[in-house]
């Protein structure tokens, strides 16, 4: 769905754009499929100490209960609505299954209201259907991919995300993820066929600082603009450089390019090529 730009009538509408909701996208969720969220002290731990900076505030939200497992095998479901979800960049779909259950799922690109979806090993190769990786042909575009069997999809869930099945060997499937990483996953794990919808989400221009504050994101102050007591980059007369060979975090650790992944993780053997 296209990005909608504002006419420049006030300073806050200059260079501002939002996701263009058309007549298909609804804003009001089904009450039984939502739950409240406790957001007291965003970015704080149990003692009230800031552990994640630049977070706080934001508009009140209801959490939509998304079915990432898609484990209703051989029970067809009909797409009833396409809805906005404030908790993620992708849109969501409300599905009515033949057995009477109602669920939310991620909206696959190209799926329309009235379409039918199916899960299971014998489901057809069609956008929105869920199958084990072993039953998919090579080159299939997929999203909402399981890492652990039965745990539900954990990879490629953002708006526009898509991975590719590039090989199958020794009961493992090789995937190329949206980040460029190539890794192995058990071929018994399931995934949804197709790409996540709302592919133009990254083209949105916030236009003003308040639009970020609505999302619960606070402004970030540069370390070089601080005092020496607050940041290793701080201090100096006027506009001075950081005074170091390489930039560091407020706590003195290397930043901007330093690999932060822990060594000797159990999943290292599954990663064939690091992300780009």
UniProtKB/Swiss-Prot annotation:
Its localization reads: Plastid, Chloroplast
This protein's superkingdom? Eukaryota
Query: Per the record, GO CC terms?
Result: chloroplast; mitochondrial large ribosomal subunit
Tell me the segments the record calls region Disordered. Answer: 225-276
What UniProt keywords are attached to this protein's entry?
Answer: Chloroplast, Plastid, Ribonucleoprotein, Ribosomal protein
Q: Pfam families per the record?
A: Ribosomal_L2, Ribosomal_L2_C
| Gene Ontology molecular function, alphabetical | rRNA binding; structural constituent of ribosome; transferase activity
Q: Where are the transmembrane segments?
A: none
Q: Which GO terms describe its biological process?
A: mitochondrial translation
This protein's assembly is summarised as: Part of the 50S ribosomal subunit.
Q: State the family it belongs to.
A: Belongs to the universal ribosomal protein uL2 family.
Q: Do you know which HAMAP family this protein is assigned to? A: Ribosomal_uL2_B
Question: NCBIfam families in the record, alphabetically?
Answer: rplB_bact
Name this polypeptide is given: Large ribosomal subunit protein uL2c
């Amino acid at each position: 769905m296209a990005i909608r730009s504002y006419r420049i009538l006030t300073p806050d509408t200059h260079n501002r754009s939002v996701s263009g909701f058309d007549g298909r996208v609804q804003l009001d969720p089904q009450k039984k499929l939502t739950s409240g969220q406790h957001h007291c002290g965003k970015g704080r731990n149990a003692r009230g100490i800031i552990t994640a900076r630049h977070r706080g505030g934001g508009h009140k939200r209801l959490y939509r209960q998304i079915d990432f497992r898609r484990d209703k095998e051989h029970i067809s479901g009909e797409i009833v609505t396409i809805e906005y979800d404030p908790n993620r960049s992708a849109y969501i779909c409300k599905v009515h299954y033949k057995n009477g259950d109602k669920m939310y799922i991620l909206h696959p690109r190209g799926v329309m209201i009235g379409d039918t979806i199916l899960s299971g090993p014998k489901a057809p190769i069609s956008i929105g259907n869920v199958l084990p990786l072993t039953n998919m042909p090579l080159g299939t575009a997929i999203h909402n991919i399981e890492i652990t069997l039965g745990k539900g999809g954990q990879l490629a869930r953002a708006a526009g995300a898509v991975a590719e099945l590039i090989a199958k060997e020794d009961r493992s499937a090789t995937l190329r993820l949206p980040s460029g990483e190539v890794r192995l996953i058990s071929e018994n794990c399931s995934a949804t066929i197709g790409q996540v919808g709302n592919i133009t989400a990254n083209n949105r221009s916030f236009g003003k600082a308040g639009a970020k504050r609505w999302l619960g994101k606070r402004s970030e102050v540069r370390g070089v603009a601080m005092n020496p007591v607050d940041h290793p980059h701080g201090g100096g007369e006027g506009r001075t450089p950081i005074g170091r060979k390489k930039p560091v975090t407020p706590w003195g650790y290397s930043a901007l390019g330093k690999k932060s992944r822990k060594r000797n993780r159990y999943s290292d053997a599954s990663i064939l090529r690091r992300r780009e």
